[in-house]
């Protein structure tokens, strides 16, 4: 393998290791990077990566400091150390490393001892450098009032900066603000536009939302086939709400042929995830014999689960079923 990087142009890995052993920090970083590629956590190569990255980082190598800081955040690693992660990420961030600034913000935001105010500082630095991930993260902080006063207008501003760069989560978050009219005038058409952008990149929440929009005709022309298409996309990623709505569409023949068995299977899939709406729909099917024999005992058990969940009042359905038993 041949590397091309400054002092190590056109050198083999053995030649770079030789330079690294003599104290060349660029060579040390490259060796650390080499061992870090796809290495299993706590494997021999992972230990070598730590060793060489730390040597380079201690000499002030910015990329090594960033990489080392990131490695200290790895879950399940025996080296995981929040304080060391912050220490090395801050070293790199202070040298102007934008990715380190965002990673430092994330570690301060989501780490063992959250410090939202400091996280905002580092997100801001990275966001102002144009980094879409940091812009989305900063938007989230303003939206939720973490480390700053809640400000939907600023959340909207930063989400839009990231969304325009194609950041899928930001596109979804921007759509949420248009949907709810927070930080911007409510606009269902623009909400649907951004949900679709995000959904096309695989965002599960956006896939569910654009399916809902097509189903209800909100911000787009009603289109049951498109609704089913996107519900299935969301369901493939584990969206329980999509399971329920697919079941409903099969039950009522929306975008597909009416199919009680398919409806029952999708409702059951959601019910297994403890979804009360799915319990209710299954109870109805058992109660009235929709696609299966009437089973009042099963219907009653499901109605009682719904009632216990507090999500809807089904006391009348319970009484009616009890009267039939």
From Swiss-Prot:
Keywords: Repeat
Swiss-Prot/TrEMBL Sel1-like repeat ranges: 26-61, 63-97, 103-130, 132-167, 168-203, 205-239, 242-275, 280-305
Keyword hit for Cell membrane: no
Pfam families: Sel1
Keyword Amino-acid biosynthesis found: no
Domain of life, per lineage: Bacteria
GO process annotations (BP): response to oxidative stress
Assigned protein family: To E.coli YbeT.
PANTHER family: ERAD-ASSOCIATED E3 UBIQUITIN-PROTEIN LIGASE COMPONENT HRD3 (PTHR11102:SF160), SEL-1-LIKE PROTEIN (PTHR11102)
Protein name per UniProt: Sel1-repeat-containing protein YbeQ
Source organism (scientific name): Escherichia coli (strain K12)
């Amino acid at each position: 393998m041949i590397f091309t990087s400054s002092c190590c142009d056109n050198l083999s890995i053995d030649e770079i290791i030789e330079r690294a052993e003599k104290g060349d920090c660029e060579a040390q970083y490259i060796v650390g990077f080499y061992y870090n590629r796809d290495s299993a956590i706590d494997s021999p190569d992972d230990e070598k990566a730590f060793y060489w990255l730390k040597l380079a980082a201690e000499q002030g190598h910015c990329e090594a400091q960033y990489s080392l800081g990131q490695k200290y955040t790895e879950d399940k690693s025996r080296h995981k150390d929040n304080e060391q992660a912050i220490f090395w990420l801050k070293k790199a961030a202070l040298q102007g490393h934008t990715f380190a600034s965002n990673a430092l913000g994330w570690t301060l935001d989501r780490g063992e001892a959250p410090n939202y105010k400091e996280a905002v500082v580092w997100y801001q630095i990275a966001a102002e450098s144009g980094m879409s991930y940091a812009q989305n993260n900063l938007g989230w902080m303003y939206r939720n009032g973490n480390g700053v006063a809640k400000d939907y207008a600023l959340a909207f501003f930063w989400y839009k900066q990231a969304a325009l760069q194609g950041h899928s989560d930001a596109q979804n978050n921007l759509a949420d603000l248009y949907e709810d009219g927070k930080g911007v005038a409510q606009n269902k058409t623009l909400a649907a536009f951004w949900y679709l952008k995000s959904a096309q990149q695989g965002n599960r929440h956006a896939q569910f939302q654009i399916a809902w929009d097509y189903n209800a005709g909100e911000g787009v022309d009603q289109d049951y086939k498109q609704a089913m298409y996107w519900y299935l996309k969301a369901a493939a990623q584990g969206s329980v709400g999509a399971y329920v709505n697919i079941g409903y569409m099969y039950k009522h023949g929306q975008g597909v042929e009416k199919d009680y068995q398919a409806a029952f299977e999708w409702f059951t899939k959601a019910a297994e995830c403890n979804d009360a709406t799915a319990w209710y729909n299954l109870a109805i099917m058992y109660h009235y014999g929709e696609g299966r024999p009437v089973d009042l005992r099963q219907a009653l058990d499901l109605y009682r689960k719904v009632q216990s969940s507090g999500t809807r009042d089904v006391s009348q359905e319970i009484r009616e079923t009890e009267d039939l038993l």
